[in-house]
Every structure is written in C-alpha cells, then in structure tokens.
C-alpha cells in the first residue's frame, strides 16, 4: 500500500486533528454513526490516526510494530518513541517544517545535515546528542527560516533544543511519550496488529 496523497481534510474529519498531516483543524461536527462503532473499527481508526499523522505506509508501520515488540518495555510506548525519533518528525517538532510531509520533502531534497553529514532518508532514527541543521546553502537556510517564523510562539518538545543563530536543533534525550501532541491510544494499535497475526 502506498503513502496517502489524497485530500487531507477528509481524513481529519474522519479521524480528528492530525498535526503531522496538516495544520488545519476539523470542524466540530457530531458524528451520528458513533454509537454503533465496533471494536474492530475503533482499533482500525487508532491505527489509521498513527499512520496518517506520521505519513507511513502500512508496511512501514508493521515493521515498526515488530521492532517495538522485540524491545524491552511496553510495546505501545516503544512504538511511539520509535516514530517520534524519526528525522522527519524531529524536523517537524523543531519547527523547521510546517508538517511531517514538508519535513520529509526537506530531507528527500537533501537540505538536512545530521552531525555534519548529509542524510536523505526521512526514516533515519535520531539518537540523543544528534545535531540537526540545514545544509550550508542559502536555499536550505531560507526554507528552514520561513518555517521557523511560522513556528514562533509554539511550545518546543522537552527532548529537543533549538538554537537560532546558525539554525540547528539538538536531540537531548529519548522522547517522553506523555508529551506527544496526538490523542491516541497506542495499545489499540498494538492490539490491532496482534489480532491480524
């Protein structure tokens, strides 16, 4: 299954606010069909929220769930930590891109350096003490600067630091799952995939 490129507002109306997909918010509409939601539908919607927010394909999400199952700790929390430490998501959280899709494009077009090395994989897993900055070209700097001007006034994640003089971000530590700005029940996502197996 490929990455979703269709109308974003339809997904937001269906699943609720997804800040990684778009910065628009859904209208407050009462869903009359909510009363008859099955358990399967609830689990599926939680999985779809996660998938569309982070811009993943179904196969990528399955791979992340398998990695999270093998790791120590709660599978749901480890899954969210893995997704939050992706390079495209870190750029979005730092404010260097307005959405995760815009951050993915920055990385794919080779505008981002991690620890002084060019990285063009949006799924690159950042580690604590990684330094993320735009490439030393005017085009890269302008793209990041425009996004940061829109980001002013928003709260920065507690696991990240942003330095404005040469525009660089620092990953302090692994993300705390309580901070994630997405209303999601990660256990339902893990349950969805455990029932599929």
From Swiss-Prot:
Residues 85-161 form the S4 RNA-binding domain. It comes from the Eukaryota. The keyword Zinc-finger does not apply. Pfam families: Ribosomal_S4, S4. One of its GO terms (molecular function) is rRNA binding. Keywords: Plastid, Ribonucleoprotein, Ribosomal protein, RNA-binding, rRNA-binding. GO terms for biological process: ribosomal small subunit biogenesis; translation. GO terms for cellular component: plastid; small ribosomal subunit. It is found in: Plastid. Part of the 30S ribosomal subunit. Contacts protein S5. The interaction surface between S4 and S5 is involved in control of translational fidelity. Belongs to the universal ribosomal protein uS4 family. One of the primary rRNA binding proteins, it binds directly to 16S rRNA where it nucleates assembly of the body of the 30S subunit. This is Small ribosomal subunit protein uS4c.
